[in-house]
Amino acid sequence: AQGAPNLTGSTGTAYAANPFNGEATSFNNLGAQVQWRLSRRITVGGWYGYGFAANRRTSEEARISNWAAFLGLPDFGGKGNLLGFLFGAAPRVLDNDYRPRFTTGRLIGQANPNLRRRLDEDPPFQLEAFYRYRLNDNISITPGVFVLFNPEGNSANSTQVVGVVRTTFSF
């Protein structure tokens, strides 16, 4: 058996990754990104992505988007270090024609108009801060924190805070 589609590589909401509840899906994605070094010590940028998903069995379509803006401060606190901030919205379904199907009765397999469409009501915002500290030419340590607002595109879900530490070895 074939697994469910994962259009967003496991980032963003479950509906964005699988907008048609496991049905065969095609996906076309457009994106743009920019990064501008304002000075030796300040870099700004961002990206925007927009995707068009189509249910391969029906004429149903879904639209998925994501975006972010970032600020980087190279050499902050020392050569090779980096202080960074990011704010954006993880992939989410903006609009979706799909409705769950009837599973019994004379309408089996048809869309049920009484059930909600698979779309994300609230934007899943993410705020991120990190500091890459260069120990030497080959090793850096990057502590950071992520704050997730409206996880899974639902404002009823509690805000999540996640601390991370990454060590990078470059040889």
What is the role of each PLM region?
Residues 1-5, 41-44, 76-83, 135-143:
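Repeated loop/turn-to-beta-strand initiation elements of outer-membrane beta-barrel proteins
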Residues 1-2, 48-54, 75, 87-93, ...:
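Transmembrane beta-strands of outer-membrane beta-barrel pores
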Residues 1-37, 41, 52-54:
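Membrane-embedded translocation segments of transport machinery
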Residues 15-20, 54-58, 101-103, 107-108, ...:
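Extracellular loop and loop/strand-boundary signature of outer-membrane beta-barrel proteins
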Residues 26-30, 60-67, 123-127, 157-163:
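Residues that define the transmembrane beta-barrel architecture of outer-membrane proteins
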Residues 32-36, 69-73, 129-133, 165-169:
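Residues on the lipid-exposed face of transmembrane beta-strands in outer-membrane beta-barrel proteins
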Residues 73-135:
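C-terminal hydrophobic structural anchor segments
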Residues 132-165, 170:
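Predominantly the C-terminal beta-signal and adjacent terminal strand-loop region
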